[in-house]
Regions:
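C-terminal ends and interior cores of transmembrane alpha-helices
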Residues: 87-109
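Short amphipathic helix-loop junctions that connect adjacent transmembrane helices
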Residues: 31-54, 165
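Intracellular loop-helix junctions on the cytosolic face of multi-pass helical membrane proteins
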Residues: 1-14, 135-139, 161-217
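Hydrophobic core of transmembrane alpha-helices in multi-pass small-molecule transporters
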Residues: 20, 95, 106-123
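A gly/Pro-rich, aromatic-decorated transmembrane alpha-helix motif that marks the paired
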Residues: 31, 70, 151-167
Length: 217
């Protein structure tokens, strides 16, 4: 007799869907930095050199991978990932909004710092690893998670060119500010999704720092 394949729990799907919000806004914002920084002031950009703009984009990439080490310490020892994840999304959302009002390189660097800090606290992956209780489901679950990550990344990268050049461009001014605001809005919506939807299904998962939870077990 064939054993019926068990599906993923609802907590997995709600948490995994959060990845779409985060990656969509990240790739929308990241793709825009280089173009925004090098575009002329007359077209709504900052008029910076290609070198400075490339450094900005590289800094966002680097810090968004380095600062999560700090975030890992936080969720391991001090605050549960269930709380840091929506807070991190809100902080990143504020960062993208800073990009929408930036008129100097300093404003962009402020955006980079806040976005990187927010992503450092975004610890959705470890939570997903804990809502999956069946060992044989772990690999398929993370494969599905990365599929949703790629969906968000693709949509963000695809939309950015259409939005800033066609949808929001007006009278020769490109739509950089509205695009950054959309990235911010997506993160705020993602935080709301996490708080009002994911929390209903997570139960005690991620409420306590992971190290304390492991010690109790």
């Amino acid at each position: 007799m064939e054993t019926k394949k068990k599906g993923f729990p609802t907590a997995f799907w709600t948490c995994a869907a959060t990845e779409i919000f985060e990656r969509l806004s990240y790739y929308l914002g990241r793709s825009l930095i280089l173009i925004f920084a090098t575009a002329t002031v007359a077209t709504g950009g900052l008029g910076l050199s290609d070198t400075v703009a490339a450094n900005m984009q590289s800094n966002l990439t680097a810090f968004s991978y380095l600062l999560p080490l700090f975030g890992g310490i936080v969720v391991d020892r001090y605050i549960g990932a269930k709380y840091t994840t929506p807070v991190g999304m809100m902080i990143a959302g504020v960062g993208y909004y800073m990009g929408s009002v930036a008129t100097t390189a300093t404003g962009v660097y402020a955006m980079i710092f806040l976005v990187s800090l927010g992503l450092a606290l975004f610890k959705n992956g470890p939570i997903i690893g804990r809502v999956i209780t069946e060992k044989e489901q772990m690999d398929p679950a993370f494969a599905m998670r990365y599929t949703l990550v790629n969906v968000g990344a693709f949509i963000g990268t695809f939309l950015v060119g259409i939005l800033y050049k066609d949808v929001f461009a007006k009278d020769g001014v490109l739509g950089f500010a509205p695009c950054f605001k959309i990235a911010a809005l997506i993160m705020f919506l993602g935080a709301c999704w996490y708080f009002f939807v994911c929390w209903r299904f997570l139960g005690d998962v991620g409420k306590r720092p992971f190290k304390k939870t492991k010690t109790q077990e």
